[in-house]
């Protein structure tokens, strides 16, 4: 009787939804990102799960607010995920 799912070759979407410790290869859910300020266009590096309010170095506007998990970016801010 064949299995319905292949445990050694899960789909990428299925792997993303799993807990970080239960994936085939363990990997964290958090990352660093470059956030661009909508006012002065300066780029600040922010942790995705920041636990404090992050302010822009140039104009002191709020870039992101902490929530229970991931930090919520302020409207108008653009970000890009940093590479390893």
From Swiss-Prot:
The modification Phosphoserine is found at residue 11. One of its GO terms (biological process) is ribosomal small subunit biogenesis. It comes from the Eukaryota. Residues 1-25 are annotated as: Disordered. Component of the small ribosomal subunit. Part of the small subunit (SSU) processome, composed of more than 70 proteins and the RNA chaperone small nucleolar RNA (snoRNA) U3. Its cofactor is Zn(2+). Keywords: Cytoplasm, Metal-binding, Nucleus, Phosphoprotein, Ribonucleoprotein, Ribosomal protein, Zinc, Zinc-finger. It holds the Pfam family Ribosomal_S27e. Binds 1 zinc ion per subunit. This is Small ribosomal subunit protein eS27. One of its GO terms (cellular component) is nucleolus. Residues 1-16 have a biased composition (Basic and acidic residues). One of its GO terms (molecular function) is zinc ion binding. HAMAP family: Ribosomal_eS27. Component of the small ribosomal subunit. The ribosome is a large ribonucleoprotein complex responsible for the synthesis of proteins in the cell. Required for proper rRNA processing and maturation of 18S rRNAs. Part of the small subunit (SSU) processome, first precursor of the small eukaryotic ribosomal subunit. Coiled coil: none annotated. Its main location: cytoplasm. A zinc finger (C4-type) spans 38-60. It is found in: Cytoplasm; Nucleus, Nucleolus. Gene3D superfamilies: Zn-binding ribosomal proteins. Signal peptide: none annotated.
């Amino acid at each position: 009787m064949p299995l319905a799912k292949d445990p050694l070759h899960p789909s990428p979407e299925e792997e993303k939804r799993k807990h970080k410790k239960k994936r085939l290869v363990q990997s964290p859910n958090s990352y660093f990102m470059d956030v661009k300020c909508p006012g002065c266009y300066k780029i600040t590096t922010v942790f995705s799960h920041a636990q404090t309010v992050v302010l822009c170095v140039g104009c002191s506007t709020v870039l992101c607010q902490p929530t229970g998990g991931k930090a919520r970016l302020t409207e108008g801010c653009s970000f890009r995920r940093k590479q390893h």
